[in-house]
């Protein structure tokens, strides 16, 4: 199970990835992670200065967190550490039927190092062992992310508000025997 209990996940390159619960002291780092996900978009906004862009990212991060808190009570909000340094965030909700990867975001310097694959792989292992589906939403224009999840066995099953709804499901008995 993907938890922030001190478990160490290893990237394919052998780098140590750990999680810890996010707390108030992480706010600015988490806003920085959020801002990194909007950097290309905000680079096109020439009428705001850097302080205005940061204020926008704070307000958007706060709104996103409030939305997830309301829709997924009990969700886990963790800071991703790569060899002990803040590298990103992962938010996961669980219920009786599914595991939902609400959000995963990595700072640019932590991307393409196997961190996301290690963490999503741990969620897939949890889904497999619990017999639950694992769901995630990917922005329709983010082809790289969609392809990443498809390589891990996710399939698009719908669209909602500009996002692909993606799902990884444990193999059913019928699929396992080729029926």
Please name every model-derived segment.
Residues 20-21, 113:
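Helix-turn-helix-type domain boundary/helix-start signal
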Residues 68, 149, 154:
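Conserved active-site tyrosine of GNAT-family acetyltransferases
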Residues 104-112, 138-139:
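A short, internal acetyl-CoA/4′-phosphopantetheine-binding micro-motif in the GNAT/acyltransferase core
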Residues 112-125, 147-151:
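Conserved acetyl-CoA-binding loop-helix of GNAT-fold acetyltransferases
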Residues 142:
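Conserved HGGG/HGGXW glycine-rich cap/lid loop of the alpha/beta-hydrolase fold
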Residues 128-139:
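Conserved GNAT acetyl-CoA-binding A-motif
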Residues 2-13, 21-25, 32-102, 107-108, ...:
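Acetyl-CoA-dependent GNAT
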